[in-house]
């Protein structure tokens, strides 16, 4: 009986007692205490205790004794219903639920999964995954905090099956023993069909009988595990105020609000959560949700694929023939990492080989495999063409798929099926052939075989009909599809655009024509090219285009003439190549591009992976990608991010960029590793280069020396140097100091987020040097003074460093912008700066003092300093304990601050109240050029970087 306390909690039962019964319970309890001579519990405290307090007092006696006393007293006050319920709960409810789950999950083989592939996945993954999840969700040592674990992986990789396998293991007692009394699985695609619900209702849907013991289930939330699958299927607003969320498990809410309340710990904060989603959705949510761990759902590796091919074919020679085709085709190989798609590809190849077809031709492009698989489901083996009914059924599915893509629906009810021409009598056939699957056994909710199958069906719809012929007004035209796909507006559109282009292949058009029995419109080619043509010359629109998606579309189309025309619409491209397959696609397109002016890319770790088996082929692709620098002679800007180069790869890049005719103006290499090769420093010797950004790329002391040697060369014209987050040391400052004294071109130096500390002194001495040549920005006028910018945010500067900075402000009249946010300057250091700001030689325009630990002790000095510096236009005081509003309303300072504000053009502050806001509104009326930005709460956790990068709401629409 002791498990009653730990499993269900005493408090719920005490709350079931009315006031009179509760008083009787206390009286009997006092008698028990006296009879048993229990010293742990005071009779006086029992008399005064609330229900919650009484539960805690009882537990001091130990769980066994607490239960024994509670059980006896409930019988004495004639609440046998509670004792019976508790006894039933202890023995029955958890076991009843586990048995229900065990039966449901053991026999749950929905048609959407081929049984063989499902069994294979269970056999391959379940034990490893069960152990991993147990480690992630069980507290270590004495730690008791609830867990929130994310499972992320690409769509269709098998996350749902993994979670259901975990549920099955829990129901069998193989994992989480004594950790969770209940584990509930909610799928967002399923749940969002309800529109509104309470948590109690969601739990009841999973219960084996109509009446779930909700109170008992929720009585001890730390024993609950909620598994929430497919977060990408729900619209989330994680910016809602906490007051807009819900903590009542019985209250109906919009399901997105209900699940947000769980995720953000407003509801049942003691419970544990296991969440699954795609990497894209995880990226959007990770900053908003405090998760404890992240697990990546691993796809099929090569060994697993090979084993599965052999099991399916049961003919060693044919299995090897089919798998070799997949292994040689990197796009197919990538697709086969998704278990269900591996089954689909293997099945297609098996059928093609068995009927004596051409499997090589089938494997040329991904679209071909999908259409071959889908059409084969609707054509009986004995027939050559589909029946009229089969044509109508597939056309209805394509209409349904298109509606789902536009409404973010992947679970459909019967009404949606009927609206799109699928009758009730069609459903058994569609379930039987595996095009649809049931998501819940006893409800009329249906899903496609796989999200990518829904996407290819939606693409087929656009080959058959115009959007105005669709029964839903949500469905838009093909041009809108293309732009939304290329701009990644809808994260769940993974292949849609690629399939549309793939279906325009001549062979696919013929295949569609044969299946549906009529010729298709040839106008779609022209429409898509017109879309791409609108990109030409539109820099803002091109900036939004995901280059890899554009490449994938053109690759799938396999039309070189169209490819050349399309690529020459682009003047700038931004892409991320995450694997070998992406390299093949990018190389195919970039080698035909000759109009680029701006290129931005990331190759992550692809060029420096340990697996050398395909490095030679990879470098051929890399050569083709870099040929764009030879073809596009007008590239002015190159941005490389998050990339690890090996020596051959960086050498290829250098050889492509070194031509004298190549006049690169701007080079950005953020978080880039060039290995031990110093080719980078050969690259930046290009005399046309004016902007160099190496932020977040580690620079050794020797590399800093090499960099500065180049900056010292007479032919070097670099004006802006960004080296934030480069792990520079104080010793490096001496080297940069020499640059400041000798460089005739350098105007902007950003050293933010490097631990410079005492090195600031060397920099400041250089800035004060009489031979410092920072004089001219552009030689148009002999009187054009440099607006020199110095960024030292988060550099470990203390009060001592302010003394050196103060000397710079007094001696260097060219210093217009000083950013020293996120340094511990404190009042002492700021007062030194204030003294310098008042100096007649100080011409500062922009001063950033965000989060510098300034207090009210500095406000008077700041007032007078700002008043005397007539050039100051931008002031940032956010994130300090210092209140600007006090400066205004202290005696003698209101007029002074008004004077200052009337001369500023930008003011950033924090902690304003209504009275101060009214003052600012009055200032705004007098100074129309003033932009005021603020934050009610300072973001004290931000570390380093540029204050300009912050996003802050306006104080009001008027301000």
Swiss-Prot record:
Binding site for ATP: 153-160
Annotated tissue distribution: Expressed in the ovaries (at protein level).
Ranges for domain NACHT: 147-470
Keywords on record: ATP-binding, Cytoplasm, Inflammatory response, Leucine-rich repeat, Nucleotide-binding, Repeat
Chain ranges of the Pyrin domain: 1-92
Inactivation phenotype: No visible phenotype, however female mice produce fewer offspring. Delay in embryo compaction and blastocyst cavitation. Disorganization of the mitochondria in zygotes around the pronucleus and subcortical region following nuclear envelope breakdown. During oocyte maturation the endoplasmic reticulum and mitochondria are aberrantly distributed in the nucleus and cortical region at the germinal vesicle stage, in the subcortical region after germinal vesicle break down and dispersed throughout the cytoplasm at the M2 stage. Loss of cytoplasmic lattices in oocytes.
Composition bias type Basic and acidic residues, residue spans: 939-951
Protein name: NACHT, LRR and PYD domains-containing protein 4F
Gene it is expressed from: Nlrp4f
């Amino acid at each position: 009986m002791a498990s009653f306390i730990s499993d269900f909690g005493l408090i719920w039962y005490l709350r079931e007692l009315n006031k009179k019964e509760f008083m009787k319970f206390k009286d009997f309890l006092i008698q028990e205490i006296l009879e048993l001579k229990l010293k742990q519990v005071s009779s006086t405290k029992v008399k005064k205790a609330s229900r919650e307090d009484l539960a805690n007092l009882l537990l001091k006696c130990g769980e066994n004794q607490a239960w024994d006393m509670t059980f006896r007293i409930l019988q004495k006050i004639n609440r046998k219903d509670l004792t019976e319920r508790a006894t039933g709960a202890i023995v029955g409810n958890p076991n009843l639920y586990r048995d229900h789950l065990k039966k449901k999950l053991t026999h749950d083989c929905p048609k959407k999964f081929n049984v063989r592939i499902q069994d294979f996945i269970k056999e391959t993954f379940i034990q490893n995954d069960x152990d991993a999840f147990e480690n992630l969700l069980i507290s270590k040592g004495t730690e008791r905090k609830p867990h929130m674990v994310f499972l992320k992986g690409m769509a269709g990789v098998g996350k749902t099956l993994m979670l259901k396998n975990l549920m099955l293991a829990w129901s069998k007692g193989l994992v989480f023993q004594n950790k969770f009394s209940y584990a509930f699985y909610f799928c967002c695609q399923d749940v969002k069909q309800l529109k509104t619900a309470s948590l109690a209702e969601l739990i009841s849907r999973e219960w084996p009988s109509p009446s779930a013991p909700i109170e008992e289930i929720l009585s001890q939330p730390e024993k609950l595990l909620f598994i929430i699958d497919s977060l990408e299927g729900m619209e989330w607003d994680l910016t809602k105020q906490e007051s807009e969320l819900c903590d009542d498990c019985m209250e109906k809410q919009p399901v997105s609000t209900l699940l947000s309340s769980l995720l953000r710990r407003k509801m049942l904060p003691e419970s544990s959560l296991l969440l699954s989603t795609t990497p894209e959705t995880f990226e959007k949510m990770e900053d908003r949700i405090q998760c404890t761990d992240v697990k990546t759902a691993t796809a099929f590796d090569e060994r697993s694929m090979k084993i599965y091919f052999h099991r399916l074919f049961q003919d060693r020679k044919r299995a090897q023939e089919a798998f070799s085709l997949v292994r040689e085709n990197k796009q197919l190989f990538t697709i086969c990492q998704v278990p269900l798609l591996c089954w689909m590809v293997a099945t297609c190849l098996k059928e093609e080989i068995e009927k004596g077809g051409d499997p090589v031709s089938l494997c040329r492009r991904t679209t071909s495999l999908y259409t071959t698989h889908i059409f084969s489901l609707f054509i009986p083996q004995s027939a050559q063409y589909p029946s009229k009914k089969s044509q109508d059924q597939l056309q209805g599915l394509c209409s349904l798929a298109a509606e789902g893509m536009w409404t973010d629906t992947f679970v459909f009810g019967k009404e949606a099926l009927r609206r799109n021409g699928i009758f009730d009598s069609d459903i058994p056939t569609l379930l039987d052939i595996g095009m649809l699957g049931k998501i819940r056994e006893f409800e009329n909710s249906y899903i496609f075989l796989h999200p990518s199958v829904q996407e290819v069906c939606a693409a087929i719809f656009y080959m058959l009909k115009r959007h105005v012929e669709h029964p839903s007004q949500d469905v838009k035209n093909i041009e809108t599809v293309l732009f939304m796909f290329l701009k990644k507006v809808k994260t769940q559109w993974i292949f849609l655009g690629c399939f549309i282009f793939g279906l325009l292949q001549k062979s696919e058009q013929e295949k569609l024509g044969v299946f549906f029995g009529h010729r298709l419109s040839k106008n779609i080619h022209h429409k898509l090219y017109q879309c791409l043509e609108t990109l030409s010359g539109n820099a803002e629109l091109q900036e939004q285009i995901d280059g890899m998606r554009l490449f994938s579309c053109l690759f799938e189309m396999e039309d070189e003439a169209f490819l050349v025309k399309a690529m020459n619409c682009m003047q700038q491209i931004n892409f991320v190549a995450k694997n070998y397959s992406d390299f093949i696609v990018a190389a195919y397109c970039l080698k035909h591009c000759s109009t680029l002016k701006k290129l931005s890319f990331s190759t992550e770790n692809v060029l420096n992976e340990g697996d050398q088996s395909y490095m030679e082929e990879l470098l051929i692709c890399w050569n083709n990608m870099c040929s764009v620098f030879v073809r596009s002679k007008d590239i002015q800007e190159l941005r490389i991010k998050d990339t690890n180069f090996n020596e051959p790869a960086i050498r290829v890049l250098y050889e492509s960029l070194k031509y004298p005719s190549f006049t690169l103006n701007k080079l950005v290499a953020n978080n880039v590793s060039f290995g031990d090769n110093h080719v980078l420093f050969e690259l930046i010797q290009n005399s046309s280069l004016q902007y160099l950004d190496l932020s977040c790329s580690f620079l050794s002391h020797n590399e800093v020396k090499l960099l500065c040697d180049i900056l010292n060369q007479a032919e070097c014209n670099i004006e802006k140097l960004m080296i934030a987050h480069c792990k520079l040391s104080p010793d490096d400052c001496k080297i940069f100091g020499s640059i400041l004294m000798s460089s005739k071109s350098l105007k902007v130096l950003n050293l933010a987020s490097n631990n410079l500390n005492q090195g600031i002194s060397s920099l400041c001495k250089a800035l004060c040097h009489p031979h410092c040549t920072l004089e001219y920005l552009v030689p148009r006028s002999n009187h054009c003074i440099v607006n020199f910018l110095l960024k030292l945010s988060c550099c470990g500067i203390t009060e001592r460093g302010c003394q050196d900075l103060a000397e710079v402000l007094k001696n260097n009249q060219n210093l217009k912008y000083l950013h020293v946010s996120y340094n511990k300057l404190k009042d002492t250091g700021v007062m030194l700066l204030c003294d310098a700001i008042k100096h007649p030689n100080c011409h500062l325009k922009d001063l950033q003092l965000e989060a510098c630990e300034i207090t009210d002790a500095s406000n008077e000095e700041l007032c007078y300093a700002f008043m005397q510096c007539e050039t100051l236009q931008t002031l940032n005081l956010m994130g300090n304990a210092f209140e600007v509003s006090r400066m205004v309303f202290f005696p003698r300072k209101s007029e002074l601050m008004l004077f200052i504000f009337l001369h500023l053009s930008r003011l950033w502050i924090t902690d304003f109240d209504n009275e101060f806001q009214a003052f600012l509104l009055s200032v705004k009326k007098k100074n129309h050029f003033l932009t005021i930005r603020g934050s009610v709460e300072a973001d004290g956790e931000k570390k380093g970087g540029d204050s300009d990068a912050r996003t802050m709401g306006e104080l009001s629409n008027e301000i």
